[in-house]
């Protein structure tokens, strides 16, 4: 998708070879409600989904010449229906957080959604995920609804929305 930035990160499409590395992060970051490897493979196969990831071009790029598998710092999935994109998953490896990687990945996903004809993006986030809510709010997402006890008793989902204007992407 894009060349490496000065920090040595590359935003690119996910491949099947990346799923094993992604699953290690997914289970670590979402131990209770992790996506399955089947869900990632199905997302890769569906034309209404877009899956990308951020990889490091640093010393841990050890799998193959294209960096598949090793060095995965973050990944995201959007699905598209009509003029709306849903941000289904955005996860940053714990040791790569607070470095702007989530912001870069979100920007790439929003650009991909706009290129595919989306006019708005919706997402849901746990009400106690303060860092994610701040990331989304900083990128002009606004809370439009709340689903009480959505994840579990006492764990609400905040529904957020952002318009994609003609200048985005």
Regions found by a protein language model. Name each.
Residues 3-9, 13-97, 103-116, 163-167:
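Acetyl-CoA-dependent GNAT
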Residues 106, 129-132, 149-154:
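Short glycine/proline-centered loop/turn elements that form peptide/ligand docking sites
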Residues 30, 40, 75, 135, ...:
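Conserved hydrophobic/aromatic "anchor" residues
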Residues 21, 134-135:
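Well-formed, non-transmembrane alpha-helical positions, independent of function
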Residues 82-84, 120, 157:
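A generic structural signal for beta-strand entry/edge sites
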Residues 122-124, 137, 142-159:
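Conserved catalytic-core motifs of GNAT/GCN5-like acyltransferases
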Residues 11, 124-125:
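Conserved SAM-binding loop
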């Amino acid at each position: 998708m894009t060349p490496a930035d000065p920090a040595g990160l590359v935003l690119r499409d996910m491949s099947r070879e990346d799923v094993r590395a992604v699953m290690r992060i997914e289970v670590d970051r979402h131990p209770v409600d992790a996506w399955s490897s089947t869900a990632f493979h199905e997302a890769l196969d569906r034309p209404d989904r877009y899956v990308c990831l951020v990889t490091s071009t640093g010393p841990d790029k050890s799998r193959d010449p294209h960096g598949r598998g090793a060095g995965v710092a973050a990944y995201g999935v959007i699905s598209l229906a009509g003029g709306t994109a849903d941000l289904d998953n955005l996860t940053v490896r714990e040791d790569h957080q607070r470095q702007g990687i989530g912001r870069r990945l979100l920007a790439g996903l929003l650009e991909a959604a706009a290129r595919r004809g989306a006019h708005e993006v919706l997402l849901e986030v746990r009400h106690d995920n303060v860092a994610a809510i701040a990331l989304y709010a900083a990128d002009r997402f606004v809370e439009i609804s709340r689903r009480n006890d959505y994840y579990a008793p006492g764990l609400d989902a905040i529904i957020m929305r952002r318009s994609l204007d003609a200048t985005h992407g």
